[in-house]
């Protein structure tokens, strides 16, 4: 009976193993959404194409050589023996292991694209993505997961903080540094010293948030697919939930205190940072360890973004280096600090030789911590040296960076002939909402400075005046009713973007002050002749006034003449009639 139960259990976890692989594949969509949302609209199609191709190209390279380098017969602890068993011995081939390791390989390659987004040549991206999938990832992953020298020592990286996220993050840092920043990101003085950092807000934060939720969902497969018992799987799910949640709360509190408001995009990065940090120790730590890992991850991602912007002057549009490299390193080290025999996966790892002892904070001393430090340094050195060579060769041959014209116009149109990834949609168009719920300012309208306009009512001279008004979108319905009440029914309404900064109260995007922040506004144009201008101004102020900054502005112009296209009437007469 026990043999039957064991067989059933093995079959169930075999199915779960493949489901986990499918979840990891689904994470490709999450990476695509995060990178697209955190960058500008003119490069959206290019980013989607890169995320598609790094998986497809990676699959080809992994089939040809990557898989054998990773899981082939061990050669001196460094590399798997090259072979073509997938073609020559398909009947006995380990299909599940191939698919599982393939989707992990693709994750490493896709991390790099975010840090190098918006200015990398598409051909160059395809080349270095292929190299990562064929050589760089499979070899170092063999050291850890393929029976290589780190695995033999007892280095522990259960799901890839080191061999996937840190390697992808290091590749991203080196690539972004060699590539250079986006045009306008850093302002320099005559001596070449950076004197100002400019914020480039992502064009679609909701899309980025969707990507984060997709990634978090996929991470349950990323971390949990290799679990072999129900208890182990449950513990992994717990730590994979606690760490990112704590990281996000930590980041929210810190940015709220530091910048005056909780930073949305930074908190989204913090969720991913917590997931990266828990990836290596997820099976061997407990809830306390996951909490501590999450706290550090939440702070580390903010520090990482600041460090790259203000000290290293490396342009990373999506925070890939702070999320993956820094937290990949942290997660690797965290095994040596928080591994505990209380976790169900610890005994499994100890029996399999993939861990040598508990963490420093659980009485295990420095044994495991030393192994983790050795592994992180070794893998980091391998990735750094290889990627410097790869990027340098690409830069010297086919070129790494897109031209200035391509970058300014956008890679969608220049690289792919895609005029817009959002064809059929107009940027900035929003539904009008009623503004009755607006909070009125402390200062009454009557106490404010009265409006004085040097104009006259339409009389014998039939004076024509143009009134242009910029207002908050939510006040439009109130304004429209006010105009109807005084007899003004003709107007042209446009959705626009406007800016205005209150002195001493700047806004921040990812810790960078924003000099100009464009906000959705409604612009109304009216040409009037029979209604007194002061009536229009007074009614407008009454409708728009809240006492807060940003209530709007009224512009008054003299109009020389008006001609009605249909009848040819001009002046005052052109403004009369049902079609005006």
Task: Indicate where each model-derived feature is located.
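Glycine- and aromatic-enriched membrane alpha-helices
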Residues: 1-458
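Positively charged, small/polar-rich N-terminal and surface patches that mediate targeting and assembly
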Residues: 414-421, 432-580
């Amino acid at each position: 009976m026990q043999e039957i139960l064991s067989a059933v259990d093995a079959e169930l976890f075999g199915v779960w193993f493949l489901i986990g692989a499918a979840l990891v594949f689904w994470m490709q969509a999450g990476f695509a959404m995060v990178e697209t949302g955190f960058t500008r609209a003119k490069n959206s199609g290019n980013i989607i194409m890169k995320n598609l191709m790094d998986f497809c190209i990676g699959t080809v390279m992994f089939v040809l050589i990557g898989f054998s380098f990773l899981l082939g017969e061990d050669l001196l602890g460094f590399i798997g023996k090259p072979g073509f068993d997938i073609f020559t011995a398909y009947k006995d081939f380990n299909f599940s292991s191939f698919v599982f390791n393939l989707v992990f390989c693709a994750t490493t390659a896709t991390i790099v694209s975010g840090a190098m987004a918006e200015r990398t040549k598409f051909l160059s991206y395809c080349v270095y993505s292929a190299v990562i999938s064929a050589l760089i990832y499979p070899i170092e992953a063999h050291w850890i997961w393929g029976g290589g020298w780190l695995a033999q020592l007892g280095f522990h990286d259960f799901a890839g903080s080191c061999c996937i996220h840190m390697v992808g993050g290091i590749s991203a840092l080196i690539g972004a540094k060699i590539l250079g920043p986006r045009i306008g990101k850093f302002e320099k003085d005559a001596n070449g010293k950076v004197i100002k950092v400019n914020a480039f807000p992502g064009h679609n934060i909701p899309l980025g948030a969707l990507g984060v939720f997709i990634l978090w969902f996929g991470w349950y497969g990323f971390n949990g697919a290799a679990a072999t018992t129900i208890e182990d799987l449950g513990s992994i799910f717990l730590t994979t939930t606690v760490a990112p949640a704590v990281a996000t709360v930590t980041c929210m509190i810190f940015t709220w205190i530091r910048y005056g408001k909780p930073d949305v995009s930074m908190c989204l990065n913090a969720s991913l940072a917590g997931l990266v940090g828990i990836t290596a120790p997820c099976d061997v730590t407990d809830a306390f360890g996951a909490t501590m890992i999450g706290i550090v991850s939440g702070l580390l991602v903010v520090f990482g973004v600041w460090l790259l912007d203000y000290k290293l002057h490396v342009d990373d549009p999506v925070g890939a280096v702070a999320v993956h490299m820094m937290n990949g390193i942290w997660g690797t080290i965290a095994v040596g600090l928080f591994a505990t025999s209380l976790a169900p996966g610890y005994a499994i790892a100890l029996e399999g030789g993939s861990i040598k002892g508990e963490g420093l904070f659980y009485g295990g001393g420095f044994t495991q911590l030393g192994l983790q430090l050795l592994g992180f340094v070794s893998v980091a050195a391998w990735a750094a040296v290889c990627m410097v060579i790869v990027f340098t060769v690409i830069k010297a041959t086919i070129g790494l960076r897109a031209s200035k014209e391509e970058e300014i116009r956008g890679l969608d149109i220049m690289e792919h002939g895609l005029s817009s990834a959002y064809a059929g949609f107009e940027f900035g168009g929003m539904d009008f909402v009623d503004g009755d719920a607006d909070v009125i300012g402390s200062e009454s309208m009557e106490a404010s400075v009265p409006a004085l306009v040097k104009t006259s009512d339409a009389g014998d001279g039939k004076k024509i005046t143009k009134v242009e008004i910029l207002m908050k979108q939510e006040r439009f319905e109130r304004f429209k009713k006010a105009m109807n009440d005084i007899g003004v029914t003709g107007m042209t309404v446009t959705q626009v973007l406007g800016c205005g900064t209150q002195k001493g109260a700047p806004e921040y995007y990812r810790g960078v002050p924003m000099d100009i922040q464009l906000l959705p506004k409604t612009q109304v144009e009216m040409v009037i002749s029979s209604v007194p201008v002061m009536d229009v101004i007074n009614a407008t102020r009454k409708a728009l006034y809240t006492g807060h900054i940003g209530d709007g502005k009224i512009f008054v112009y003299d109009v020389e003449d008006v001609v009605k296209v249909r009848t040819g009437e001009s002046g005052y007469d052109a403004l009369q009639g049902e079609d005006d």
